[in-house]
Amino acid sequence: MLRQLIVSTVGRRMPLQMISQSRLASNLDKTEYTTPGEIVDYDDPPHLPVPEYPVRPDEPLQTRKQRLLYQSRKRGMLENDLLLSTFVAKHLKDFNAEQTAEYDQLINGVSNDWDIFYWATDTKPTPPQFDTEIMRLLKEHVKNHEKVQRIRQPDL
């Protein structure tokens, strides 16, 4: 009986077949297009210009660190917000000028934040130009050997 009828929130009864047909407008199952665990990664179309990130050689180290702290917390993608903000809270204060420049290039030189996430989690191989000391440090941070909960960004 339960499988045949579903009581809607307004108290109206609707046959299960009607619900399953109206569930998707096209009546196609989404599994026809992707498989579980598949990475959907398309190349950027050639007509989409990605602006070059401006190099800031005269920026003071303290100003650069403050900017990177902000940019690490505000990626627009929760996964990277959590990974990068906790990474920066732990390591940025100890970075020298060269390491800070490497980190700047890593988070701002890549046009797609998903690339950073996939590289850091070893889902995709890291390209040689981004396989630096900082990326290796980030990969170790992502492994979370200390089993620290990272469900929110650290306080400022």
Swiss-Prot record:
The protein's UniProt keywords, in alphabetical order, are: Chaperone, Mitochondrion, Transit peptide
Q: Which organism is it from?
A: Drosophila erecta
Enumerate the subcellular locations listed in this protein's record, separating them with semicolons: Mitochondrion matrix
**Keyword Chaperone on this protein?**
yes
| One term under GO cellular component | mitochondrion
Q: Which family is annotated? A: Belongs to the SDHAF2 family.
Q: Which domain of life is it from?
A: Eukaryota
Q: Where is the transit peptide?
A: 1-24
Q: Does the keyword Nucleotidyltransferase apply?
A: no
Q: Name one GO biological process term.
A: protein-FAD linkage
The UniProt subunit note reads as follows: Interacts with the flavoprotein subunit within the SDH catalytic dimer.
Indicate what this protein is called per its UniProt record: Succinate dehydrogenase assembly factor 2-B, mitochondrial
State what this protein does.
Plays an essential role in the assembly of succinate dehydrogenase (SDH), an enzyme complex (also referred to as respiratory complex II) that is a component of both the tricarboxylic acid (TCA) cycle and the mitochondrial electron transport chain, and which couples the oxidation of succinate to fumarate with the reduction of ubiquinone (coenzyme Q) to ubiquinol. Required for flavinylation (covalent attachment of FAD) of the flavoprotein subunit of the SDH catalytic dimer.
Which HAMAP family does its entry note? SDHAF2
